């Protein structure tokens, strides 16, 4: 056998898997036609990227009977994403494995390329996942640690960060330490957060696990300043001893005009089905090259070069880190393949305009809530310490009761922070208008009148 490794693309991988033997043409070409006809039959929404489309919420199929301020939990697909999903779904329904053979190699790469363009990184640094939680699990399960090494996280992080770290602690005795960054979120400051982080980093700290925007309060961490503090702590350390700044970025990704590279983080996990308005059940992990070297794959990839390595009885050393850490197996293909359209939607809208719009609506909501007697806004007013999430306490009333009354009495959809301390939570986004915010404010005011 030649020392030169054979190249095998994903199509060949599927053929070798016995799924596509003898398939030479795209079955179900009518699937494309059917999907196009279905898209044309929808209401006449403006195309993403047009001038009208920048303020036209008709791109989303949200129930007009409600003011929905919870699309940050699970996105409503904009029209271009719906069309792409239906196009691929029609092809898969008509041709199944035949369509998969034709489409999968191209559209998987297109999804990764679009994500990389949005992130401003090489595509080989991007792993595709199903969610933030999956990405965090992959990150923390196989972070290379030695006895005595520790991971520092915070008391403000979500279950999706705490639980994989707890499981890792059980598995091999890794030390996980939690710190507190602030007491009252509405009074937080950049200096206080950075001081808390700096004081927590020790010689055996190997990773700092944080969340960009806290879903418990709406606090947005000053990641650039935290990254600078980590860099100072890393002076004089070798590559293995270096502290990695690992981030759950889901409530900033798609809402903020910044990328993980801009922010100076090392590892970044996010779902694409929240503020990005991408296909439900999609996500990604990005890591810098030095950070990928510290993360071992968990689930076998279906990348063709890794399959060749298996055939030839060797390790997949030539597979780039992003594809190597993309979990293999069959998944919701039509949703992952529509990621490209989601990133294009944001590109055409303008990432800076998305952030500006999101902040403007959140500011309107925070200021309005603060003017209502009995309401304490827990999210900082400072836009450098907040994003789109807005949390508040209403006359010390149970948040769950308030959410139910808002929905039943006022047709306003809000949520409860999923933590031991519960607040009423809103998330105005580009799927909303000023009138939605005003209606929510009127509803809250009526509850405390």
What do the PLM-derived regions correspond to, one by one?
Residues 2-6, 12-449:
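Pyridoxal 5′-phosphate
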């Amino acid at each position: 056998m030649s020392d030169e490794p054979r190249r095998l693309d994903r199509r060949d991988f599927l053929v070798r898997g016995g799924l596509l033997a003898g398939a030479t043409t795209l079955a179900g070409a009518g699937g494309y036609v059917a999907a196009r006809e279905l898209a044309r039959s929808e209401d006449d929404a403006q195309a993403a990227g047009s001038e009208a489309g920048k303020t036209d919420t008709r791109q989303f199929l949200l129930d007009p009977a409600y003011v929905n301020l919870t699309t940050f939990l699970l996105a409503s697909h904009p029209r271009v994403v719906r069309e792409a999903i239906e196009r691929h779904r029609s092809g898969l329904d008509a041709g199944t494995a035949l369509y998969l053979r034709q489409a999968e190699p191209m559209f998987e790469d297109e999804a990764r390329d679009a994500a990389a363009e949005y992130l401003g990184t090489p595509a080989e640094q991007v792993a595709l996942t199903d969610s933030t939680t999956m990405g965090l699990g992959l990150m923390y399960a196989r972070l290379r640690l030695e006895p005595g090494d520790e991971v520092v996280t915070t008391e403000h992080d979500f279950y999706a960060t705490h639980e994989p770290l707890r499981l890792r602690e059980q598995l091999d005795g890794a030390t996980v330490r939690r710190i507190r960054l602030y007491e009252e979120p509405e009074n937080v400051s950049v200096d206080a957060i950075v001081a808390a982080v700096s004081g927590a980093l020790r010689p055996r700290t190997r990773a700092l696990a944080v969340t960009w925007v806290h879903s418990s309060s709406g606090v947005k961490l000053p990641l650039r300043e935290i990254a600078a503090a980590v860099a100072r702590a890393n002076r004089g350390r070798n590559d293995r001893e270096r502290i990695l700044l690992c981030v759950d970025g889901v409530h900033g990704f798609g809402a903020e005009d910044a990328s993980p590279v801009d922010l100076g983080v090392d590892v970044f996990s996010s779902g694409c089905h929240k503020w990005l308005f991408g296909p439900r059940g999609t996500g990604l992990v990005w890591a810098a090259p030095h950070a990928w070297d510290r993360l071992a794959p968990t689930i076998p990839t279906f990348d063709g070069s890794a399959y060749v390595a298996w055939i030839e009885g060797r390790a997949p050393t030539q597979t780039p880190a992003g594809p190597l850490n993309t979990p293999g197996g069959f998944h919701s293909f039509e949703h992952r393949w529509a990621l490209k359209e989601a990133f294009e939607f944001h590109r055409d809208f303008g990432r800076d305009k998305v952030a500006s719009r999101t902040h403007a609506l959140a500011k309107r909501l925070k200021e309005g809530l603060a003017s209502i007697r009995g309401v304490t806004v827990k999210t900082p007013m400072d836009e450098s310490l907040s994003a789109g999430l807005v949390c508040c306490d209403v006359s010390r009333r149970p948040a769950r009761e308030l959410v139910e009354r808002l929905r039943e009495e006022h047709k306003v959809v809000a949520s409860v922070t999923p933590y031991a301390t519960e607040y009423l939570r809103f998330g105005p986004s580009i799927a909303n208008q000023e009138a939605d915010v005003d209606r929510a404010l009127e509803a809250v005011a009526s509850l405390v009148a």
